Amino acid sequence: SYEEAGLTLDKNEESDHTTSLHLLDRITDDWKRKRIQKGGFEINTSEWKFDFDDEGIPTKYFRKKTNRSHKIIEECMLMANKIAAIYMKDNLDESFNHMIFRNHDIPSLINEQRIRKIFNRFKFNLDSKHGAISSKDIHRFLLDTKDQSLKKFLSISILKKMKKANYGLNSIGHFGLGFNLYTHFTSPIRRY
């Protein structure tokens, strides 16, 4: 289970049974670091879970707990989706127009201006004053925000300024992940 894998990783014990898990943890950390260096950013928001009674009425709500094993699965799924998109683009005949890509466009001009206002309010210097805001700028801004409550608030504020991701027959890239090509070869990540 995710919980057992998370505990194994937290204990940092090496054995015949855990060596692969620890190796995968290091590999996915490296993938994430490279993804962020190339322009991906991470907006951490809480995922909420609900308990329901027999009539379907919510009785309790709580934040879904995640651990390192969830992050491993997330990075593996991102990589599988990226590689599947690259494979489709490189190996399928262009006349075969049933390739479906997951696209996430850059923010609209008005929302980019709103993000700039947030950056200016917190005296954040952009890498490029006149160019479009990059996903690297957003990542650096959130990384520089040390107050965790403020970071969550700013993450949600910026997330609301993003265009929604969509599916298309042509790839325009995935702004938030920093990928040129992306698809949903796996199930959407939020389900795990």
Functional labels for PLM-detected ranges:
Residues 1-192:
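Conserved, carboxylate-rich catalytic/transport cores that coordinate ions
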